Design a protein with these regions (language model features):
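ER/Golgi luminal nucleotide-sugar-dependent glycosyltransferases, focusing on the catalytic module
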Residues: 1-296
Length: 296
């Protein structure tokens, strides 16, 4: 998913050009597609699909979930893929593509780590957050709270009580898991409605469906953390420094990144992180193996 920095997105997609990967891109509706110059992309192995249906993305809003689900559906309809990896346009791979492909091909593993919502986070689902109201959103959230208008901090599905789970937005799920998520939402549309006015539902809706499934919960990398575990330790795929906000990574983080054993790092930015990405590319170059014909 991309909303800024077309130059960085170009570098990311061309770095991921590999016989085992295809790329599906959603560009924020607020952005001008012409700035991205997709017609100039010259991929040798990966198929590139740019979604025509676009959502106006707002931070913390359900629109991020809608865009993610649109990408899932597009990929499900386009081919028989084994793994669905969600990335932002400001991510960058740490390992060579062949190593990434090997790691992500592990069977019966869901690359996601999460936990039941902690008490200090109950507000994320109990309160109503009206992100589309712009500068007035806080007023309405406080008004609803003062009037005692709140949601339950759990959701009922097929007469079962589901706890709400948290997990960072970026993960890599199996085709079976993605199909389960889409089927569940189709059969139970009230789930999407429940999270519509939540706080950052992109970190709640998909984890809640996944971790309330006994089959997929045991396939996750982690389904529980000690209370107050830092966000940085909850990312399944990414090296990230969220202190106090997401750091734009530079070359001084190189050794931390390369020793992290994560698959990707974020955030990177063209003109700021170029030396870091060059260093990663150089470290990986000798390990890259010539690729063969495209495989779905």
């Amino acid at each position: 998913m991309a909303h800024t920095d077309p130059q960085q997105l170009y570098r990311l997609i061309h770095t991921l050009d590999h016989a085992g990967f295809d790329c599906f891109i959603h560009v924020d509706k607020k952005s001008d597609l012409r700035d991205y110059g997709f017609e100039s992309y010259s991929l040798h192995y990966s198929k590139l699909t740019v979604l025509q249906k676009r959502y106006r993305i707002r931070w913390g809003d359900i629109s991020i979930v809608e865009a993610t689900l649109a990408l899932y559906r597009a990929a499900m309809e386009a081919g028989n893929y084994d793994r669905f990896v969600t990335l932002s346009g400001q991510d960058y791979p740490i390992f060579p593509n062949d190593v990434l492909a090997e790691k992500l091909s592990a069977p019966r593993v869901e690359w996601i780590m999460g936990n039941i919502l902690e008490p200090k986070e109950y507000h994320k689902v109990e309160n109503f957050y009206f992100w589309k109201l712009g500068r007035f959103k806080k007023c309405f959230t406080l008004l609803f709270s003062a009037l005692g208008i709140r949601k339950r901090r759990y959701i009922t599905v097929d007469q079962e009580k589901w706890d709400v789970y948290f997990a960072p937005q970026w993960h890599a799920l199996s085709s079976e898991c993605v199909a389960h998520i889409l089927r569940t939402l189709e059969a139970h549309p009230h789930i999407l409605k429940y999270f519509k006015y939540a706080y950052a539902p992109d970190e709640l809706l998909i984890p809640t469906i996944l971790f309330n499934s006994s089959e997929f919960r045991v396939r996750s990398l982690a389904s529980a953390f000690p209370e107050d575990t830092h966000y940085n330790q909850k990312t399944a795929l990414h090296y990230i420094n969220y202190e106090p906000c997401v750091e734009i990574l530079r070359e001084n983080r190189y050794y931390e990144i390369m020793s992290s054993q994560k698959l990707f790092c974020r955030k990177v930015k063209a003109g700021v992180s170029d030396q870091l990405m060059d260093m990663i590319d150089k470290a990986n170059q000798s390990e890259r193996i010539p690729q063969h014909e495209h495989e779905t």
